[in-house]
Structure formats: structure tokens, C-alpha cells
Regions:
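Solvent-exposed loop and beta-edge segments used for protein-protein assembly and interaction
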Residues: 49-53, 80-82, 112-116, 149-151, ...
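Oligomerization/assembly interface segments of phage tail-like spikes and tubes
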Residues: 42-66, 114-128, 217
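Short polybasic amphipathic segments
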Residues: 2-7, 86-88, 165-168, 191-194
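Intrinsically disordered, low-complexity segments enriched in serine, threonine, and glycine
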Residues: 130-229
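Short, acidic/charged, Gly/Pro-enriched secondary-structure junctions
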Residues: 5, 60-103
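Short beta-strand and beta-hairpin "edge-sheet" elements
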Residues: 26, 87-128
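A short, compositionally biased
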Residues: 1-2, 79-85, 159-164
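Solvent-exposed edge beta-strands and adjacent loop segments
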Residues: 1-52, 94-108
């Protein structure tokens, strides 16, 4: 039996058990497909992104000493607690989490007022996130950072320092015209900011927002930059 944790709350708090491991749905690549009359085959243009995937769990519920209806209401409140995406973790891939939104309402089967069963489905972003990737790595001198996955990752980079500086990550060069203590560059959101202040006007990107390729990525900086996280 397995465990799921959604929006920071564990299924164990509701006496829920996942009956078996979920299936693994691979993400679909996002293509623009065009057909030219008189020409054999379609033209596929890779947009460089993937579509969402579904992740479903068959769960069994034990009401214990609680009334079944009360327990069912608790579970519904839990699954609908997030507005949009929230962290989804499970005991089958403990080193990863996903960003997921609960998408399926349904009927919880009532078994003699003492137990229940339902399939819950989440609409997930296509990527999995390594939990270790949420731990900041501080770079104070030229270094190499390893991406252990087989896919490019989109980092959140905190640049510390003052004044003007240049940051290189692999083939990506970032010029910052004015750093005031720190500045954050978010490759997922494609945004630069400091707290709630937009700083896109301070940043020049030679090759778009940086990505960490599979394997080692060299990081170096100059000017007023003192460290990078």
C-alpha cells in the first residue's frame, strides 16, 4: 500500500491507502502540424514543450471511528484545497514531486459506512521535479553544476552583488546592468525580478533564458557579481 501527499497533506491523515502503484503516462510533445495540399505527409514543427499528463490513484478509505459522510467530506476538502497547481508526492517516486491540480470529482463508494473506494486523478505538468533540486547551490567562483536528468531544466537563479555584472551558464550569457544586493532570474517564468519588483529591463540575454543541459554546465561570472545561487 502506498501514500500520496498533496498540497502538503498526507493521505495517511485520512486513513487512506493507495491500493497499487499508478500507471506512468509519458508526456506528449507539442507539435504544430500543417498539411500542404499536393504534398505527401504532414509537416511537424516542434514547439519545444510538452503537454500535461494525468496521474491516477485507486485509493481505499477506512472511516475508523468517524462517520463515513464526515470522512468523505474531509477528503473532498483536501483534494480541492489548492487553487491551481500544488505539490503532488507519492511513496513510489520518493525523490521526485510533481505540480498537479486535482481534476476529477467522483463518487466515493460507501462500503457499509465503514470504508470506501475511489479513483482520484490529477492533471500534472509534464515534468517531474527532483526534490534535491530545491536545495540552493551557492557558487562563489567558476564551477560546474551537474544536471543528472536526461532533460534540460529551467533554473531559478539568484544573482548576488552590486552594479553591473555578466553571468555565463554554458552557452547562455546574461548581462545585468545594475544589481542592487540581488536579482532573481526565473527561466520557467521567463522573468527577472527582485521581490515583487520587475527587473526585466536590467537584464540582457544573449541566447534566451538559461537552461541546464544534461550533464555538466559551467558557471562563471564577472563584474559586480559576488555569488550565484
Amino acid at each position: 500500500m502506498g501514500v500520496i501527499i498533496y498540497n502538503g497533506v498526507s493521505s495517511e491523515e485520512f486513513a487512506i491507502q493507495v491500493e497499487h502503484p499508478p500507471g506512468y503516462e509519458t508526456p506528449e510533445k507539442d507539435y504544430e502540424v500543417t498539411h500542404i495540399p499536393g504534398r505527401n505527409g504532414d509537416i511537424y514543427v516542434d514547439k519545444g514543450s510538452y503537454k500535461n499528463v494525468s496521474r491516477s490513484y485507486d485509493i481505499a478509505i477506512g472511516a475508523g471511528n468517524k462517520d463515513f459522510t464526515i470522512m468523505a467530506n474531509f477528503i473532498s476538502e483536501w483534494l480541492n484545497s489548492a487553487s491551481g497547481y500544488a505539490k503532488l508526492e507519492d511513496s513510489y517516486e520518493p525523490e521526485y514531486y510533481r505540480l498537479a491540480a486535482y481534476k476529477s470529482g467522483g463518487t466515493i463508494e460507501n462500503i457499509l459506512q465503514h470504508a470506501g473506494r475511489i479513483t482520484v486523478a490529477f492533471d500534472c505538468k509534464p515534468q517531474r521535479f527532483l526534490k534535491s533540486g530545491d536545495i540552493p547551490v551557492i557558487v562563489r567562483t567558476t564551477s560546474k553544476l551537474r544536471n543528472p536528468t536526461g532533460f534540460k531544466s529551467l533554473p531559478i537563479i539568484k544573482v548576488n552583488g552590486s552594479g553591473k555584472g555578466n553571468l555565463r551558464i554554458g552557452d547562455y550569457v546574461i548581462t545585468i546592468s545594475n544589481i542592487s544586493s540581488y536579482l532573481t532570474i526565473d527561466s520557467e517564468l521567463q522573468d527577472a525580478y527582485k521581490g515583487t519588483t520587475n527587473c526585466n529591463s536590467l537584464v540582457t540575454l544573449s541566447n534566451g533564458f538559461p537552461k541546464l543541459i544534461k550533464g555538466e554546465n559551467e558557471i562563471s561570472f564577472s563584474g559586480g557579481i559576488t555569488s550565484v545561487e
